[in-house]
Amino acid sequence: MALQQIVEQTVAGLGYDLVEIERSAGGLLRITIDLVWVPPTDEVSAAVGVEQFITVEDCEKVTRQLQFALEVEGVDYTRLEVSSPGIDRLLRNEADFKRFEGEVIDITLKQPMGAAAGGQVHANRKKFRGTLERADSGGWQIVWSDEPPVKPGQRISKKRVPAPLQALGFTLDELREARLAPIVDFKGRGTKPGEPG
C-alpha cells in the first residue's frame, strides 16, 4: 500500500482530516492533520459554539496509531512528526475553499498571467494575496487592493483617491499552491459578524 493511502486511511479512521504529507531529508516524515469540517447549517449556526482546534492529545493519538500502521506496512522513516496545520494552512480541495471563504489567502499559479493580465498586473506575476470569494462563474476569485498599508499615526489626505479593488478568477487546476495568509493581529481578536459581542 502507498504511503499516502496508509496515512489517509489511518487519519480518517481516527476522525481527522489529512492536510499534508511531507518527507524531508534525514528521514523526517511530517504529517499535518485538522479536524473534519462540517459545513454550517441553520441548526449549527444557531447554536453558540466555540471554534475547535487540533490539540496535542489529538497529535499524540494519531502519532501512536501511525507508528503501528507504518511499521506493519514497512514504511522507512527515521522520525515521525504529527502537527496541526498552523496559521498558513494549505488549501487543497473544494471543501477547504468553501471552509475558508472570506479569509485572506496566498495563491501561486502554475503559469504566469501573461496576456490575460491586461496591463493591470505584471504579466509574469504568479503570486497573489487577497480575500477568497466565490466568483459569479461558479469558480473562485481573490480580491485585493494595491493600496499601501497605513502606518500608525500617519495622516491620510482626504483628496487621495483610494486604489481600486482588483479581482483574479481561477480554478483549482490553475493553482500550484494556496494557503491561508499568515496574518497575526497582536491587538486582540475581533468578533466576526454574527458572533456574540
Curated annotation (Swiss-Prot):
SUPFAM superfamilies assigned: YhbC-like, C-terminal domain, YhbC-like, N-terminal domain
UniProt entry tagged with the keyword rRNA-binding: no
Keyword S-adenosyl-L-methionine: no
InterPro entries: Ribosome_maturation_RimP, RimP_C, RimP_C_sf, RimP_N, RimP_N_sf
GO biological process terms on file: ribosomal small subunit assembly; translation
GO CC field: cytosol
Protein function: Required for maturation of 30S ribosomal subunits.
Highest taxon above the source species: Bacteria
Subcellular location as annotated: Cytoplasm
Name of protein: Ribosome maturation factor RimP
Keywords associated with the record: Cytoplasm, Ribosome biogenesis
Family that this chain belongs to: Belongs to the RimP family.
Coiled coil start-end: none
